[in-house]
Amino acid sequence: LDEGGARLSEAGVPDAGTDAWYLMEAAFGIDRVHYYLDQNRPIHAERLEKGYGRYQEMLQKRAERIPLQQILGMQDFMGMTFSVDENVLIPRQDTETLVERVLRDYPEKDLKLLDMCTGSGCIAISLAVLGGYQNVTAVDISEAALRVAKKNARRLFLIQKGTARSESFQ
């Protein structure tokens, strides 16, 4: 962990120690609570070897400034965890503000909502789940982005809410 934090710090990664923690948790499949509670518990050699190799790969990607969320494959948004990859933008706090405003200002559940360039689907899915909107459509020109959105919709049991592909948005 110290080695990972130092490596990221040398690469100029902000919050290097925190990022090293997140990467270690993902690589070894342990969380901080278990790490501290079970410090003296040995890790099986196979798990240690596999985890260490994965940790080194993840550290290298982060040192190359690949976003942490992209390496981990997930980002929390509006209290839900969304899958993300290099084909979509990482959901951000300012986008949560947009969703919160829609939820506050448009309480009618029968509205037809369209999320253009949906990416991960975080806006459309959040509006459907948190707002209870019955007609939410998410579209994107990128098939790769739509795969991510569909994965998120399936995981949150919303695939029937609609994910479509369009060549143009005229």
Where in this protein do the model-derived segments appear?
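Conserved SAM/SAH cofactor-binding pocket of Class I
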Residues: D94-Q170
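A general secondary-structure junction signal
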Residues: Y22, Q75, S166-S168
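Non-catalytic accessory regions of SAM-dependent methyltransferases
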Residues: L1-R41
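Short alpha-helical
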Residues: D15, I90, E143-A144
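A general structural signal for well-ordered alpha-helical segments in protein cores
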Residues: L1, A20, Y55, R65-L68, ...
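Conserved AdoMet
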Residues: E25-R104
